UniProtKB/Swiss-Prot annotation:
ATP binds at residues 10-17. It catalyses: sulfate + ATP + H(+) = adenosine 5'-phosphosulfate + diphosphate; adenosine 5'-phosphosulfate + ATP = 3'-phosphoadenylyl sulfate + ADP + H(+). GO terms for cellular component: cytoplasm. Residues 1-200 are annotated as: Adenylsulfate kinase. The active site is at 84 (phosphoserine intermediate). PANTHER family: SULFATE ADENYLYLTRANSFERASE (PTHR42700:SF1). This is Probable bifunctional SAT/APS kinase 2. It comes from Sorangium cellulosum (strain So ce56). Its EC number is 2.7.1.25, 2.7.7.4.
């Protein structure tokens, strides 16, 4: 591959040197020769004697650019990590270097001042230091850099993933089996030359919309004077899922272009596959005072302001079209359609910045963000991870398909949905006790991670199966189990529609591999769990109870056959039904 230059620019303390070091370690692990021209090191050696006048700074950058060009000409990668505050001199280097990648490390002054251990920003702001870049000396931000990383809001690993994705897209570096791991441990593994990369997040970047430190305090204060939008249980969970990156690449609620293409084609406006509209609906009255280009505060049901939305769009959707395309029905008996029709007639689109969790986790021991699960998988050395979505207790059929999937993967993530579900679904706390008991007694614990998925259930069947798969990709799963009637309700979808819908995309577009399973049962012929593919015999040889039949048994305090459910799980369910009756 041709040589190239990665030109980091940004204010002092914005993370240029840190990211250059991380990127160089990752590229060396991919057998790319790298030379890093760090700003302080260059000033000590290459540019010794130069001052801080504009002329001297330009000379410094020209020297760095010349050396970087020579390194790239030799076929290597040169990285520069100087502030390089002036746009004209940076553009001059771009014009002279054939393969030039500008990375703008953006960060707000209050955040930089807070993280500045030397206290230079505070002194500059107080007037004690003169000619300090970004305070009383100008810094001209790039207008069209190849990559922008917001180091005040993103983790180092997330910023690194964005840079790598662009370098891979440009063809400057080889793709690595999957992608860079999004954790410090994984980065260390890469630096050591290990092949421990995980699947890339959807869109190449693990989004992080949390606001922290001084920026958080500033935004929270500003939010007090903004118009308020009330969140409900669904949109509260959506805010959290966007914030933690589970809905990557979404950075907020969809605008009308993304929304319409998702509804009609299951793609974002960029062309990236995405199957579910993620929208913020409001009443006519609430929408009336809001204008595109302004901000609004998002208020949780308990009265707290938890986020701010930067409004980029406002429109009236065709909800009948949305219902038919997404849920395949307009009947309000369908819980997804019922919710859709109950919400306001106006949709608001825009990126969000999140101050606080809308709802505290009911299961903190199992509450892991995508960045956290990725770090866990990397530390375990897992590369092939299969995700299993469930909103029900795990019975023998589920146990069978998860263990079958685990045979071809390094690890299994049991990822129960604990957000809003139907009123007749089994409560999340009861289900969690079932999962704990089952994993403790019937799984190899070192190969299984139990972690909650705090999203709302939408009951969109086939479309939601794709949505669930893409979310698990963001959590680091390379594989995803799709069983019979995934995310279905009633008789609105065919038994295997949720498997067949994946054929709408060409191989590789989704970036995650589905493992499709037929209905599993206990076969009296083979004396084990099986499917119609592996066990002969008619229906009389299959122990396969309906959900209604199981509920009747449990309500009477009777254990289902052990071929259907582990007795430990059944006892927990019986106890729950007795206590709730």
């Amino acid at each position: 591959m041709s040589g190239f230059v990665v030109w980091f620019t940004g204010l002092s303390g914005a993370g240029k040197s840190t990211l250059a070091a991380m990127l160089s370690a990752e590229l060396r692990a991919r057998s790319v020769h790298v030379e890093v021209l760090d700003g302080d090191e260059v000033r000590t050696n290459l540019s010794k004697g130069l001052g801080f006048s504009k002329e001297d700074r330009d000379t410094n950058i020209r020297r760095i650019g010349y050396v970087a060009k020579l390194i790239a000409r030799s076929g290597a990668c040169a990285m520069t990590a100087a502030i390089s505050p002036y746009k004209a001199i940076r553009d001059e280097q771009r014009a002279q270097i054939p393969h030039f990648v500008e990375v703008f490390c953006s960060c707000e002054i209050p955040v930089l001042a807070e993280r500045d251990a030397k206290g230079l920003y505070k002194k500059a702001l107080a007037g004690e230091i003169k000619n300090f870049t970004g305070i009383d000396d100008p810094y001209e931000a790039p207008e069209s850099p190849e990559v922008v990383v917001d180091t005040g809001k993103e983790t180092k690993e997330e910023s690194l993933a964005k840079i790598l994705a662009k370098l891979e897209e440009l063809g400057y570096v080889p793709r690595r089996g999957a992608a860079v791991a999004v954790s410090g441990a994984a980065a260390a593994g890469a630096a050591a030359g290990g092949a421990r990369g995980l699947i890339a997040p959807h869109g190449g970047e693990l989004v992080n919309r949390w606001v922290e430190g001084a920026a958080k305090a500033s935004l929270a204060e500003r939010a007090k004077g903004l118009p308020v939008i009330e969140l409900d249980e669904r949109t509260e969970s959506d805010v959290e899922m966007i914030a933690i990156g589970a809905f990557s690449p979404l950075r907020g609620f969809m605008n009308s272009k993304d929304y319409l293409r998702v509804v009609r084609e299951m793609r974002l406006e960029s062309g990236l596959p995405w199957s579910m509209p993620i929208t913020l609906a409001v009443s006519e009255q609430a929408a009336e005072g809001l204008r595109v280009g302004s901000e609004a505060a998002l208020r949780a049901r308990d009265g707290r302001i938890v986020a701010v939305i930067e409004l980029s769009d406002k429109w009236r959707p065709n909800k009948e079209l949305e219902a038919q395309e997404v849920f395949r029905t307009t009947e309000t008996k369908h819980p997804g359609v019922a919710y859709l029709m109950s919400t306001g007639p106006v949709y608001l689109g825009g990126e969000i910045r999140v101050l606080e969790r809308p709802v505290d986790s009911a299961f903190p021991a199992y509450d892991r963000s995508p960045a956290t699960t990725r770090a866990y998988f990397a530390e375990k050395g897992w590369r092939r991870i299969v995700g299993f979505q469930t909103r029900n207790p795990i019975h023998r059929a589920h146990e069978f398909i998860t263990k079958t999937a685990l045979e071809i993967c390094d690890g299994l993530m049991i990822h129960p949905l604990v957000g809003a579900t139907k009123s007749d679904d089994i409560p999340a706390d009861v289900r969690m006790r079932c999962y704990e008991e089952l994993i403790a007694k019937y799984y190899v614990k070192d190969r299984v991670l139990l972690s909650i998925y705090p999203a709302a259930m939408r009951y969109a069947g086939p479309r939601e199966a794709i949505f669930h798969a893409l979310a698990r990709k963001n959590y680091g799963c390379s594989h995803f189990i799709v069983g019979r009637d995934h995310a279905g309700v009633g008789s609105y979808y065919g038994t295997y529609d949720a498997q067949e819908i994946f054929n709408a995309f060409s191989p590789g577009e989704l970036g995650i591999t589905t493992l499709n399973f037929e209905n599993a049962f206990y076969s009296t012929v083979v004396g084990a769990m099986a499917t119609a593919k592996t066990a002969p015999g008619d229906a009389s040889t299959q122990v396969n109870l309906s959900g209604t039949k199981v509920r009747e048994l449990l309500q009477r305090g009777e254990l289902p056959p052990p071929e259907f459910s582990r007795p430990e799980v059944a006892r927990i369910l019986i106890e729950s039904m007795r206590s709730s009756s």
